[in-house]
A protein has these predicted regions:
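Cysteine-nucleophile active-site neighborhood
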Residues: 216-230
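RNA-binding accessory domains that recognize and position tRNA/RNA substrates
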Residues: 1-212, 225-227
Length: 230
């Protein structure tokens, strides 16, 4: 494992080891206190552009499930089609995993998706820093590379456009008792799944959809939100 350093905007440095894809990245450093669910969290579009810190001490011990689609086109075990977080930061990564539904390790999945992972970080101390000073930008640098990489800025990237669908997608078409227009600004698949379980027809449209020529009447309107800093 290569040495890697997480550098925060306030100058704080946290040293660890790499277990994912090896590339320098930058983004907003945030934390997640869930004990399980890293496949769902990593594929959640609301984490786009962020370095995700997991406070639970042991991560990876139940591996990663297969990527499969339900008949309606939704991911069975994940919240979207791919990882959206820029990186994952953990205290203790387990390469060995055991779960009836696991097909690969977290590290192998990260490498395949080209997402960095850091282990050996005091994630609870890092969380204290973020809790006391607020989330801040940070960057990941490897031991043999310059840590003077450009700082990330949300103003440079339209994350809503990145995570939104590119065309209209219909679910339960013609069969739902109610019709919902869902504006996709970074929707989790489980939100759509919950609507479908309630016998709702969902019309999922891109964030910049042109409503002037709309050819249907919806009973409700939902707009999903992805986190953006101006």
């Amino acid at each position: 494992m290569r040495n890697v350093t997480l550098i925060l905007d306030d100058g704080s440095r946290f040293h660890g080891k790499s277990f994912g894809f090896e590339k320098p990245v930058a983004g907003e450093v945030v934390f997640n206190t869930a004990m399980t669910g890293y496949p769902e969290s990593l594929t959640d579009p609301s984490y786009a552009g962020q370095l995700m810190t997991l406070t639970y001490p042991l991560v990876g011990n139940y591996g990663v499930p297969p990527f499969t689609l339900e008949p309606n086109g939704l991911a069975t075990f994940m919240e979207s089609e791919h990882i959206h977080a820029e990186a994952i930061i953990v205290s203790d990564y387990s390469e060995n995993y055991s779960h009836w539904n696991a097909v690969e390790s977290l590290g192998d999945w990260l490498k395949r998706e080209q997402i960095p992972g850091i282990t050996g970080i005091d994630t609870r101390e890092l969380t204290k820093v973020l809790r006391e000073h607020g989330v801040m930008m940070g960057r990941i640098a490897f031991d043999d590379e310059s840590d003077e990489m450009p700082e990330a800025s949300y103003a440079d990237v339209n994350y809503v456009d990145k995570v939104s669908c590119k065309e209209v997608i219909r679910y339960n078409e013609g069969t739902g008792k109610k019709k919902v227009l869902l504006v996709d600004c970074g929707v989790k698949h489980n939100i759509i799944r919950c609507l479908l379980k309630r016998d709702v027809e969902v019309i999922r449209v891109p964030w910049d959809y042109d409503y002037t020529g709309i050819a249907f009447v919806a009973d409700s309107f939902i707009r999903t939100i992805v986190h953006i800093d101006e």
